[in-house]
C-alpha cells in the first residue's frame, strides 16, 4: 500500500504527520468506504436458518469500513473506521468479519465514536 507519510524519511516524532482521517467522524474525504453485505457473511452466524430467513428479506449492509493506506513496515500504525449497522441474525447482533495484517507487528486501536453496544 502507499505510504501516508509526506516522504520516505524517518517519522518525525516532534512534527508528526498529516493523514486524511477525521477523529470526530472516523472518515476520510478521499477514500471511499468498502461495504460488507449480509450475503457476504454466510457461514459467520451460528443460526443458519435465521441467516437464510434474514437474507430472504433483503441483503442489507452489515458494516462498512474506511481503510487508509499505510507503510507496511513492522510497528507502523493502521488507521481506519468501521461503521457497524444495527441488526441481528437470530440471537446474534451484526459483527465484522475480521481481517489480517500482512505485517503482524502492525498496531491498531479501536474506540467507539458514537452509539453503544
Q: What positions do the PLM features span?
A:
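Eukaryotic intrinsically disordered, low-complexity regions enriched in proline/serine/threonine/glycine
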Residues: 1-39
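Active-site region of the double-stranded beta-helix
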Residues: 27-117
